[in-house]
């Protein structure tokens, strides 16, 4: 391109070069992180020599963490709690790289990470919770069951509150329907006649876990 700027097909090569130099970033991440453990970001990337990861407290309610994921996202970010820049240089910047980034998270809560590439118009964001609670559902009986356990040890948790929700089909909002408590085996039984589409476990100050869908 530099040697033959007036070549009749030079614009084709310019467009191809622009495509090759466009940054690409795909990320898989945890929905829930155990307090004191790491948020793990699994990356596939091209042309991203550096990545800056910022983590904010989320101002959303946990049941609405996934709703309108990109709409009004900035206005729903609270205090920034972390900022880390990672060097992602590769010998051949035109080939896809993969890497895993880890960021320690200590305090319970709902958060949003925002990843940018310095000097590039590329931003990737998502939300996650820091919680000790995990919830598994079983719908083999007339009364669906929820098992609440410690996310790390798998130990059943007695006395946890399971909040259940349905989706308002008119406006897409998630509406709270009620709550039940877990027994000594960590099991809560949901009402059979209610239309329940999502559940979320809560235990005292551990109240920011993201909803689980019931199918």
Role assignments for model-derived ranges:
Residues 1-215:
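N-terminal, cleavable Sec-dependent signal peptides of secreted/periplasmic/extracellular proteins
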């Amino acid at each position: 391109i530099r040697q033959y700027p007036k070549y009749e097909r030079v614009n084709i090569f310019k467009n191809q070069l622009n495509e090759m130099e466009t940054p690409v970033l795909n990320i898989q991440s945890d929905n829930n992180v155990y307090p004191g453990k790491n948020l793990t970001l699994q990356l596939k990337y091209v042309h991203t020599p550096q990545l800056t990861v910022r983590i904010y407290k989320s101002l959303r309610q946990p049941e609405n963490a996934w709703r309108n994921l990109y709409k009004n996202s900035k206005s729903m970010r609270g205090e920034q709690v972390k900022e880390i820049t990672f060097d992602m240089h590769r010998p051949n910047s035109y080939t896809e790289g993969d890497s895993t980034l880890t960021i320690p998270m200590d305090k319970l809560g709902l958060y949003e990470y925002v990843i940018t590439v310095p000097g590039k118009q590329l931003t990737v964001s998502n939300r996650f919770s820091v919680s000790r609670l995990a919830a598994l559902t079983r719908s083999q009986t007339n009364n669906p069951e929820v098992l609440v356990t410690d996310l790390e040890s798998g130990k059943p948790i007695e006395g946890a509150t399971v909040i259940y929700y349905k989706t308002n089909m008119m406006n897409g909002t998630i509406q709270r329907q009620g709550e039940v408590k877990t027994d000594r085996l960590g099991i809560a039984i949901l009402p059979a006649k209610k239309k329940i589409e999502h559940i979320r476990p809560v235990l005292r100050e551990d109240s920011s876990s993201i909803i689980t869908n019931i199918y």
